[in-house]
């Protein structure tokens, strides 16, 4: 997921010792709290990449 890759890097920079499972939990919570209008660009980019890789 495009958004999670970007956000994961941010979390890892702030908390380099945080376990991957905890990072994933935080990312899931953050994603659920994002309003749809903020999610749409990332969803569209993920779809574009999916189609590109299928070609």
Curated annotation (Swiss-Prot):
Origin superkingdom: Eukaryota
Cellular component terms per the entry's GO annotation: nucleus
- Pfam families, sorted: HMG_box
Keywords recorded for this protein, A-Z: DNA-binding, Nucleus
User: Which InterPro entries has this protein been placed in?
Assistant: HMG_box_dom, HMG_box_dom_sf, SRY-related_HMG-box_TF-like
Q: Where is the protein situated, by its record's location annotation?
A: Nucleus
Enumerate the GO terms in the molecular function aspect: DNA binding
Q: SMART domains, alphabetically?
A: HMG
Q: Does the keyword Metal-binding apply?
A: no
Residue intervals annotated as DNA-binding region are 1-55
Q: What is this protein called?
A: Protein SOX-19
Organism expressing this protein natively: Mus musculus (Mouse)
């Amino acid at each position: 997921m495009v958004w999670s890759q970007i956000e994961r890097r941010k979390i890892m920079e702030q908390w380099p010792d945080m376990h991957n499972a905890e990072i994933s939990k935080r990312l899931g919570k953050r994603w659920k709290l994002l309003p749809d209008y903020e999610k749409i660009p990332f969803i569209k980019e993920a779809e574009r990449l999916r189609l590109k890789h299928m070609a």
